[in-house]
């Protein structure tokens, strides 16, 4: 005969970062089995090598996940519970097993194949098997009720043994194997798990702890047998537990497990023995001693346990309902079968009922379970009878005499714990999100190890505590204003603070702050504060919506001896719900600093990550918050609290500032002054700038909320094809996108590139369009700070060659360096990835990036945005006020130069477009340079690299004698006539850059037709501007420059002929430069007048021309000695004109003194 039994296991799985729990589930109410329609959640696959490999098997039925029943649930609900488990999941499963069942014989012992099943510890201490059996054709619900019906028909419950009754009183199952060799007491103390023991042959079987069933077995290699009534050789005798109380003739029958009672009938002999034993007085326990005579003998016991109602309070809902009675056996709790369930698991089920508790009970008319006589542990001399100390169960009468009904808060028997163990319980339960009340479940005795003797005195001590109902307390009446705000049932207490307030708090901003414990003897206790009171206000601080950490800190900061006024309301029902569900704090934050993992429980994170904080006082201690990472994978752990986060953020900000300090500036100056490194100068500057992360105005933790944006969010694109993408969006979708125009800065501004006013962005948004912005990462952070929430998309390139290929295909006329674009993209990805809202991978093989770009923008526009919960410092609610705040000096512009911001741009002379054109950009596009100090001479090598539009190979081919002759010092320094000499001294700076490229451009055929006008004319017009570098030069001047170029080409190739041309051009450049200097001076005066406390215009006295003035540059002036030698080498080709000879002598004398005769005139341009 074959029967299907169900073995139950509890498995704890550690989640793997890559494989998860390593299982797949199927089934559910919405996905029943295709053959039999079963709705159980079934393990459909176990990943080899995963966390569940060897622990779970296919076709296992999931009964419970972390205390949540999985019976008759949706498939999605089961999957969600597994995902919410975090790193650890406790899964209870039941596994079908077929066993051979043989009919029972009279006296011969049953064969091992016909008895039950074998319990093997397969899971390394992480699983247990309850061992209750069910027929495969019945569900667990039906089987439970049928099983009890079988017990009533066959087993006669009124004749069950006292031991069986005690099993049901505790609801715990212990499985022990008794073996001659295995004396080890390896027992598993985790809740809901079975314990197996191997005991010596002399080990005397004894049930110590009343209400705990002990399933003993002789060894793993032997099967369990049935009730002792089936075995005629199970002789009697007195157990050491009862030899002093029980009489040998009064013995009761040992009860059979419900499964065997259901499936088998006792033999005639056992029936007669059963009837014989039933004649004894059922009110007296009997003692039984079982002794092995052979090593392979078995005790033949298989015990079980059951939850029953031990006591009911007078004022509880169960008593008011009238359908429940003390002694009723609970079969189901909210649909979950309670057989072999621990009290701890039963308590969890009840706590998760959330106000609705559904029970299925079996009425015990004789109330056998609650009438068990009181017994004490025997003082037997048999060594190591049991390591389990009993937890005495009092009768209802005894319990009522020792403490009142108010000590109970639920049917799960939350008993007041001892003061010595309060701290331990507080630390254990505070992880649930609230500091616990001083209550503790009787729980698992094997895990807690609490002795019966230690519990009895505690009840007797707490018994005489006066009850608050006996003497009603009259509280102070709050003010009418407080009553109007907090309600009429508010009570007020007032006392002076001692060493501490004496309160332990629970809850948080999500549910309110509650009193979780009161220190005995404190003023708070004397004034009538009670556990479960909600604190609404302390002195002037409103506690509603306050996080628990802030509430504790506020109470701690109250000075000793100061009066404390507390407004509170008694809300015990809400308080119990808080403890049951573990709710407390709940708010969202966004990090603005980096944090590494400190402890195994900590979370590592970077800037821009969002967390949900669920406990601000983790483990009852300050310093850490318990948070859940919001993202693709929910992860729970510890993060620094607000104060520690601010300290860490300030340290990181200081390190960022030190990384870009003035030491790097002087290093750049050294590179600028040394020869042979000009080519890599800009690259070094960008490397230094990229190494410094973008600074931010945000605090370390920004409280955020998920909201929808009610406007078209601005769009910022980064990457090697950002300019092309912006142009396509504005051209192909003009109804949705508009490029924000750049404007020149005011005169005297420090930055060199164009800017975008926020007012321009707002105007585009008011037109219901996306504003396309070409701004820096720092400007993006400013947009986030001002709550414009830009959509920031980064184009991630695959390789440098891919960038070059795609740009040549999309923009053939562009000559931007692919190497620079690729390097800058990598730097942005490394330092500013927290600003990106989306990333699009750019592949040179296809052009699918544009469709992805449009889809990404539309998707992000429709999605909710994490917005700041409170307004930032200096920000107003109204948009107009916010804009007026942003239009203040220094905050109303967004830099349009798409390079990383650094301190070196202020004085770095190697400015230009944000990519290095490397002599490939046409001269028609003027180079936009950074601010340059006028006192710094421009070196000859720099002019060769930056001014000439021709490649290096062409430069070498154009190295003719005329070119060498033109490389001589600028003729603008001609001493005669004196007026020309005094004027030309000021603007020699402009011509030192333009002399050599002039001849080079005129030497190359077709240079002008290709868009390369001679730099002789171009440089005085827009070379090295100081105030408005991005403003183009008026066209009439360009025409004049073109005429001067033609005149220069027809002029004689003598020095005097060239001098006349240069003097004419120098005069025009001087006028323009003087006008710019005057505008700068006016702008500085205007700024200084508006902000006298910030700005001041330096007044410098002019120095006499006599003597050598000090140089303003960090390097000494470089006299043109090498060009002079070149001039002397070629002087033979000019003839022996005495005027030329005299000019050379005066020019040489001028060169010895340096470039500038009056450097003080330029010192006012230093910013």
Curated annotation (Swiss-Prot):
UniProt keywords, alphabetically: Cell junction, Cell membrane, Membrane, Nucleus, Phosphoprotein, Repeat, SH3 domain, Tight junction
Annotated transmembrane regions: none
Primary localization class, coarse: other
Feature: compositional bias, Acidic residues: 1037-1049
Function, as annotated: Plays a role in tight junctions and adherens junctions. Acts as a positive regulator of RANKL-induced osteoclast differentiation, potentially via mediating downstream transcriptional activity.
Family as reported in the entry's similarity comment: Belongs to the MAGUK family.
Protein name listed in UniProt: Tight junction protein 2
Organism listed in the record: Mus musculus
